[in-house]
Amino acid sequence: MMDQEEKTEEGSGPCAEAGSPDQEGFFNLLSHVQGDRMEGQRCSLQAGPGQTTKSQSDPTPEMDSLMDMLASTQGRRMDDQRVTVSSLPGFQPVGSKDGAQKRAGTLSPQPLLTPQDPTALGFRRNSSPQPPTQAP
């Protein structure tokens, strides 16, 4: 009676054995089927003997215009997401009368900032004012 309880505690059932013939057969079948699926999805990228591939150094005009349009569109999207900062602590805007200078090729202004006071650039761990504390 005690021997049967010890065997069930150890978990020695037909599925718990490592490397049982049923498990080995299942994993062999699974490996074979998955291997066939992978082979079926492969394609050969080599050109045949009579075929020549087009040189990648000669992009078509359509591809050039597509890439130009894509770069322009993405540039405008980036410009739309930019934030203009009117003032930063320790800095004063320098440049045109609105405090910003247009960057070449973009529609958004880029502020030019110079430090007002070098000591103002020291970053403190907690720069917010603390309320006064009273002793208990």
Curated annotation (Swiss-Prot):
GO terms for biological process: G protein-coupled opsin signaling pathway. GO terms for molecular function: guanyl-nucleotide exchange factor activity. It comes from the Eukaryota. Residues 49-59, 107-117 have a biased composition (Polar residues). Coiled coil: none annotated. The modification Phosphoserine is found at S127. Residues 23-45, 63-85 form the GoLoco domain. This is Purkinje cell protein 2 homolog. The lineage of its organism: Eukaryota, Metazoa, Chordata, Craniata, Vertebrata.
